[in-house]
């Protein structure tokens, strides 16, 4: 299967939204609420520390006063449908 990472940049009222989606099947419901906790990982400790999403969310919220969220969703690229997780970064536009 071809691995896809799909980027979308959208304007939503006074906000810019960056969506980063993949086709890796999504995040299981039983861990979705935990992925932003520090040191949470589903990988072996030698492959990750579990602080990437925690730090990403803190940067978006504290430095940019924005939000970082995720959802499992279907998306389409060049008439092909894919399913995976989508991370959305939402930041207020500054004029």
Where are these predicted regions, by residue range?
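Detector for a conserved hydrophobic position within an alpha-helical segment of the HATPase_c
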Residues: 60-61
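Glycine-rich ATP-binding loops of the HATPase_c
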Residues: 64-78
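Glycine-rich ATP-lid/hinge loop adjacent to the conserved G-boxes
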Residues: 39-49, 64
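Short beta-strand-loop-beta element adjacent to the nucleotide/active-site pocket used for signaling
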Residues: 2-18
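Short C-terminal beta-strand
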Residues: 78-94
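Acidic ATP/Mg2+-coordinating residue in the GHKL
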Residues: 22
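Short alpha-helical Gxxx[C/S/T] motif in the catalytic ATP-binding
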Residues: 52, 56-57
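Short conserved segment of the HATPase_c
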Residues: 27-39
